[in-house]
């Protein structure tokens, strides 16, 4: 195996730190609210300057909001309105994406995208998108005839009349990218604070004073990357309010057995509510259908609904008539932060110097993240008059996944560490060694979902029904806590309620030790 960087993170120590109140007030030059891909991209770029930097995330891990539940598409940039922040940062971000993923060791594939017209009337819409894309500076756009489209994608529906090909379209793993951005920032001095929900904020003209669930925070520059909660942050400090509406999108995910159905990401012509229902491969070999678009009031409502999931199947059938309904392995939903002006809200707030917004970040926010990160980090550094750091640590490289190793690599890995030979997740071929490394790494996992997003354990066809008890046992051992205390995604989402044969009140703290057996699964 290739020699890996020395692990510099103790999962057990970090879990204890992230669950305790602060020892006094935290003071930073700059502080970011929000640990999604935007907040972490800003943090990574801002760690290039000599300043004290904090990031506050209310959940138990980074990438727990919009950044974990989206289409994972790197958009070319033809859809955004020319002259908008979306158009500008989309095209710039697309150009930055491939080298960024290479540097951070994150999977990325430029698989191209196709916008399909399903009638001759729709061909005019394709020409309009192509013209818009060219105004935005997008390269590699062309119109395909029906015959050319079928040669590229034989499974496309019979009513497809033509398509817009975008050669710069791509796919990535958004949660792996977010975790890697955060880890790189931490290696370069970021003070990441999880389980840290921001409440009241005031500005005294020089300092921002934040009350959080773990204690007080003070900073000179405050960067608002709070996703669907960005209006809650902004409106405490500015007399010019903004409004963010949660727009829920639901998805279906299909098994790897149908991964070769389409090579490109297939869009239908977009509407005012978004880019419509897509059919897309993922970098992990599964197939994704969705999303829907439903404006809601609840900023935490990520339920799936039978009505919307049926809508996906009905609309996607036009793209994929032979859609194999027996190959679905899960469904999920995510929220997009939709601003009233239908554009990103970026930059320093006019009536609150030092407050920098990254608000209203919906599609193409993932694509735009590298460009937004650079732009807003430079803005913050200029306001603080901070000098550039002379040294910057390279990104941490995780071990190569066992499933991607050649036979000789696997044999060598097992000889060096027998834990490489113990398969924990059969569907995704994830080993014990990978799970332990995912806990004891920069920005390591402390939950079952944290393990899932760092290793793919639990993401396969059985959806964690086999590996969950084994993952819990390893987490318990590495973190030094009872399995009864472990959660799926933090915030009280405990998986186990007690030992079989015992009565455990749901609100009492667990008293079992980490090695206790005979545990009962929660079905709440």
Question: What positions do the PLM features span?
Answer:
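Helical element adjacent to the flavin cofactor pocket in flavoenzyme catalytic cores
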Residues: 164-221
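Extreme N-terminal leader/targeting segments of oxidoreductases
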Residues: 1-30, 48
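N-terminal Rossmann-like FAD-binding beta1-loop-alpha1 element of flavoenzymes
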Residues: 28-55
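C-terminal catalytic lobe of FAD-dependent flavoproteins
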Residues: 180, 270, 274, 283-284, ...
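Short beta-strand to alpha-helix junction loop
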Residues: 82, 86-91, 116-125, 164-183, ...
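Glycine-rich FAD pyrophosphate-binding loop
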Residues: 47-69
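Dinucleotide-binding Rossmann-like beta1-alpha1 core, especially the glycine-rich loop
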Residues: 72-152, 276-277
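Flavin-dependent oxidoreductases
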Residues: 41, 201-206, 210-290, 294-305, ...
